[in-house]
Design a protein with these regions (language model features):
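Sequence/structural signature of beta-propeller domains
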Residues: 2-19, 23-25, 33-405
Length: 405
């Protein structure tokens, strides 16, 4: 049976404060916790065919618009070629942190709209660091993690819905015996609030987000056993919805159960729109990558979008008119335009790939209604790191129709 730890935290059912809207274009830019310083794919399959709006075009700072071709440094800027990195110095204006271990997850801090500050989670080291352009990365805490599996470690990160008051954050980690959710409070030792999530040789990645009601969404891997994902007695391969104490959210369809959806394999990201209208989870199945719309009390059902070419879907950011997905195999950002009924049609707007991109991407978090923070994992297996990897970047969203001259 899973165990829970009671956290002493004041709860308020508030939406997260919007982090920021950065301009008009997606811009890339174990001890106690210390908070003192605070080629394009061509095989997509959509759900029902309607006529969508065009999604926003993700572009980098200094660019007039997106480009689908072009090196991992995002070298073409508005004013000419951007020099390649020199050691840990990266000249791309989208980059806000460099020379990290593979960054599995990022979160943007609330109240840093025009000058983003974030927290970055390193998968293999267990470190969580504060990142801000122009400042050295500041260690917040280090979690004990087991990295003997290919996909385990520190893989998920989320802030308390009342972070500006309590500075609490949550992390998803792999240990020698299980996967679990940790609560991290300023000046205190990280504590588990949900344990007993099955661990396997694969399928250990778990991801976190907070929904618009202030509850924690936890998407768990299947621990390498698809049967566990459909077993109602197991926490593997599920979407869980818990409160800050690790207990089932009281307004879950079954108030006594944390499970709100079943059938995941290797979730890459979970995200909720700031207006509370949509929540999504990405997943890598044996035959295709998928994006599911989360609806409490309903099965995952037919994916809202599928990628038979398996680009390695990872973190996501949900906007009112589109969903942006980072990929770690294809190494790009794919933006899907939402129809009014919540479905997608057309093909994804692909950007930040090849020479215009940053290589393998993993974590993503929304910043306001037009921006996102993302991370690279080029130092993970299969990556081709440059000297400044791994990095945290900022993306801003330009309305469709804008392009490079």
């Amino acid at each position: 049976m899973p165990e829970t730890f009671s956290a002493s935290a004041t709860r308020r059912r508030l939406r997260w404060p919007a982090a920021v809207a950065i301009g008009g274009a997606l811009m890339m830019a174990s001890g106690c916790a210390d908070f003192a310083g605070e080629a394009a794919p061509n095989s997509w399959q959509p759900a029902p065919a309607l006529s969508p709006e065009q999604p926003p075009n993700p572009v980098l700072p200094g660019q007039a618009g997106p480009s689908s071709s072009g090196d991992q440094g995002g070298r073409q800027g508005q004013n000419g070629t951007i020099p390649p990195p020199q050691g840990c110095q990266d000249f791309n204006p989208a980059v806000i942190a460099t020379c990290l271990d593979a960054v599995s997850a990022v979160v943007a801090l609330p109240g840093t709209d025009t000058d983003p500050i974030g927290l970055a989670a390193e998968r293999t080291s267990g470190r969580i660091v504060r990142v801000h352009k122009g400042d050295p990365s500041q260690l917040q805490t280090t979690l004990q993690v087991d990295t003997s599996t290919a996909d385990g470690g520190l893989t998920g990160l989320a802030l308390s819905p009342t972070y500006t008051q309590d500075q609490l954050m949550f992390a998803y980690v792999t240990t020698a015996t299980d996967n679990r959710v940790m609560l991290i409070a300023p000046g205190d030792t990280p504590k588990p609030i949900l344990t007993g999530i099955p661990r396997g040789t694969t399928g250990n990645r778990g991801v976190l987000a907070v929904d618009h009601r202030g509850e924690l969404l936890v998407a768990t891997g299947d621990a390498g056993s698809p049967a566990l994902a459909t077993n109602p007695a197991s926490l593997a391969g599920k979407v869980l919805r818990i409160d800050v104490d690790g207990q089932p959210a009281p307004d879950n369809p079954n108030p006594k159960s944390a499970i709100v959806a079943s059938g995941l394999f290797e979730p890459g990201g979970v995200c909720s729109s700031t207006d509370g209208s949509q929540a999504w989870v990405t997943d890598r199945t044996p035959t295709e990558d998928v994006l599911y719309k989360l609806q409490l009390g309903r099965p995952l059902g037919v994916p809202a979008w599928t990628w038979p070419d398996q680009p390695g879907v990872a973190g996501c950011a949900a906007f009112s008119t589109s969903v942006m997905v980072a990929t770690s195999t294809a190494g790009n950002v794919q933006s899907l335009a939402l129809n009014k009924d919540g479905s997608f049609t057309g093909t994804p707007q692909i950007s930040l790939q090849g020479p215009q991109g940053f290589g393998k991407l993993s974590g993503m978090d929304i910043i306001g209604d037009r921006g996102a923070m993302a991370s690279t994992v080029n130092r993970d297996t299969g990556g081709t790191p440059v000297s400044s990897d791994d990095r945290v970047i900022i993306i801003t969203s330009q309305p469709a129709g804008g392009g490079q001259d």
